[in-house]
From Swiss-Prot:
It comes from Influenza A virus (strain A/USA:Albany/12/1951 H1N1). The gene is PA. Gene3D superfamilies: Influenza RNA-dependent RNA polymerase subunit PA, endonuclease domain. It is found in: Host cytoplasm; Host nucleus. The probable endonuclease active site in the N-terminus and the basic amino acid cluster in the C-terminus are important for the shutoff activity. The C-terminus acts as a nuclear localization signal. The C-terminus is recruited to host protein complexes involved in nuclear Pol II RNA processing. This is Protein PA-X. It holds the Pfam family Flu_PA. Plays a major role in the shutoff of the host protein expression by cleaving mRNAs probably via an endonuclease activity. This host shutoff allows the virus to escape from the host antiviral response. Hijacks host RNA splicing machinery to selectively target host RNAs containing introns for destruction. This may explain the preferential degradation of RNAs that have undergone co- or post-transcriptional processing. The active site is at E80, D108.
Length: 252
């Protein structure tokens, strides 16, 4: 899964996800599904914001090409992806400037057109179930909730989807592509089901035990559960695509 994430997502998103997991003391070598989920969530937040601006008349417009002569303001402030200290600094600044009520939990975005914070959700389950979980956690009518699924479904507060249909379709298409790519690599079942993930973990450990008596030297740079994998960077630049080679038991 880690190899897939590094190949599938923009290096900047991968780096932000790594920092987020490190900040919370989580090991991406072990919690690879969480690593993939964080990258997916980050990308959706960025796609949500992409190309959306507010012009001089205060109208929301979509601009896909940079125009240096246009006096435009980004419609959305991206809060997700920042470290907690900086994220709260941005939230406090927005509240002081706009008079918005300070949220109890860090939101993902702020919409300058609608003057509201937005919580973005990406779920592998039913959208309405995840929506209710988000709503029960946030307990604030001031924060707008928008949930996307990998099956193309979505749900938003008061059925207000904020973005135009084309922008939302772009997000849904990307999520569907991620799902298809995972499925083609045999990763989707373990990603969508914790039970399947545990089965895969046991399978990896069993493979490791079978290799224990061989002469194959296993890298200690990876977590115990994933020692049968030996990631090899093809260059030192983190913006390059990760290639991986898999250690196998030698034939007897």
């Amino acid at each position: 899964m880690e190899d897939f994430v590094r190949q599938c997502f923009n290096p900047m998103i991968v780096e932000l996800a790594e920092k987020a997991m490190k900040e919370y003391g989580e090991d991406l070598k072990i919690e690879t599904n969480k690593f993939a989920a964080i990258c997916t969530h980050l990308e959706v937040c960025f796609m949500y914001s992409d190309f959306h601006f507010i012009n001089e008349q205060g109208e929301s417009i979509i601009v896909e090409l940079d125009d240096p002569n246009a006096l435009l303001k980004h419609r959305f402030e991206i809060i997700e992806g920042r470290d907690r200290t900086m994220a709260w600094t941005v939230v406090n600044s927005i509240c002081n400037t706009t008079g918005a009520e300070k949220p109890k939990f860090l939101p993902d975005l702020y919409d300058y057109k609608e003057n509201r914070f937005i919580e973005i959700g990406v779920t592998r389950r039913e959208v309405h179930i995840y929506y209710l979980e988000k709503a029960n956690k946030i307990k604030s009518e001031k924060t707008h909730i928008h949930i996307f699924s990998f099956t193309g479904e979505e749900m938003a507060t008061k059925a207000d989807y904020t973005l135009d249909e084309e922008s939302r379709a772009r997000i849904k298409t990307r999520l569907f592509t991620i799902r298809q790519e995972m499925a083609s690599r045999g990763l989707w079942d373990s990603f969508v089901s914790p039970r399947e993930a545990k089965k895969q973990l046991k399978k990896d450990l069993k493979s490791q035990e079978q290799c224990a008596g061989s002469l194959t030297k296993v890298s200690r740079r990876t977590s115990p559960a994933l020692r049968i994998l030996e990631p090899m960077w093809m260059d030192s630049n983190r913006t390059a695509t990760l290639r991986a080679s898999f250690l196998k038991c030698p034939k007897k």
